[in-house]
Amino acid sequence: TAESQLSEQLVRQLNKTLNITIDKNTINSKFSPVGDYLQSDILTEFRDFANKSQNLSIGLHFLKNKEVELKTTLSGFNYDKDTKLEEIDGEARLVPVGANQYDLSSIDLTAKNAEVALLNGENTHVYFKNATYHFDVKPGESDKRDLSTKFSSDILRVANKSRTTEESQATAGGLNLLVKQNGVPGSINFHHEFKKLSDGSLSIKDGVNLLTKIFTQNDRFDSSLSVLSVNVPKNNQPYFNLQNAGLELKLANTDLTKANVDFKLNVESVKQTPADEERKWEAKGGKVNIQLDDYNVANELAFVPFLLDTIAEKEAPSKDNKDFLNAKDKWVKEFSGKTNIEAALKSFNMADLVLDDVSASDKTETLDNDQYNEHITLSANKASYPSAGFQFEKLAVDAPFKINHSKAHLSARFCSAPFYGALCSTHLTSATFDKYIKNSWKELDLIVDNATLNLNLNTYPETNAYPVKLEVSGIVPQVPEDDSSDMIPDNIEGTFNLTLSKMLFDDQNEKALAIKDNSYFWQYLSSFVKHDGKLHREFVEEGDNYVSRVEKTENGYLINGRTLEDLRQESMMESDEGEEEKPAATD
């Protein structure tokens, strides 16, 4: 056993580096005469940046297997005006990696209270209560490592220049974060990047590159984030509230040209309560699942540098960026994979929109023969529009599509997509960008195979619901090169069948009639089918329904089996008959 103190030179260096004044320190050591055991306890009393007395104890234990255990307890620490810690406990384990060289194996930290400023605290002043942090490293195959990070906090508050009081700050309760990265190359060092984040020297470009590395510089990435509540006030009044939300993100990154992505989001409830009653809304039971299989993430990442340039650029360039066009062409040529997007919502309430038990899906698949399949579904138990006086019930949409010559269509539509459109506007000349937008649908070669819409249409408030059915099938070929028209091309072929229950127009329920008389929707629907109580010639009566069948062929349009010329002649005959029936004028 031996007792010693830190050297004066080291004390001066610590005082300068940590903004502290060390008043007293003692080192108590226990060691084995044969040198296979050493334990040191360091006790330090110091005054921090705020001149507050603090106590620090550090236990250093050299184990027989050459590993090192480090335990520390800190009463508190005010590093500067923006960084403050209270009641910190920590444990760490170091493993030997060479002669007198050690690498971090694991670390655990807890803090009763912590106040941290990121980016100099301008807009990211963060407060934690009862926070925990865990990090461990395990050796993987060859020079790769497996990293695991856990973080939790009972309370997290975010302040900025406009949210200086606790009542005005965004608050999250019950925050839990888990990140696992398997197969991280040994050359990747996140420490230096996070150090830039803490001292405010991390630029937007550095931040984007850091996130890209965290998500993709590994063989597999698994993460989850959950929170019990989030509250964001406005003008010291409740404004935004989120309850019991969680998300998961899993990435299989072994081959970024054929990556798998799995994303899940669940929200128990979320609402926004602005002062304007018409803008208040609340949603419950929200779920989103996104799966991407064999997706070319590498080609998506190739646009990151262009995105960073877009942030700085404000005007269209004088000439097209060839590197950007090459990246676009490569993206189109190698586009592949399957996607499956599913979303569900138990309820949604807003002044003029009420939804009950809504779900939707969108499945896509690229095929080897330059085809692209897509299948969209939508269902809702109820969708109500109070101001218009109507309600959809048992809504079901089923829409399968097939796109031929999909690569040409992807290239033509590239600049019309929201994300890629922003890139096009800053890396292509205005003339080139406008050309892409104008011709965005010219390469579409689409097959619609019996898309259907079924619903029961009711008034709001509810009275009686009656069925509506729509069936669509068709072919939309590519527009000929010599067609400069912006209109729908003439070579479209297909069928459009609409079936409406007669009772939508003939129901004599007094409550329903009163609602319909004061609804622009019902008035329009009535005028769409009938005029002065007489059925429009585009509809025919079949049993309990009014039906309209529209067929487009290479020879033109047929409506309920009749040509447009037949309908025109019929209209002229009816007009002539009406003129004959008018009483003669008298003097």
Over which residues does each language-model region extend?
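Glycine-rich, small/hydroxylated-residue low-complexity segments
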Residues: E3-D587
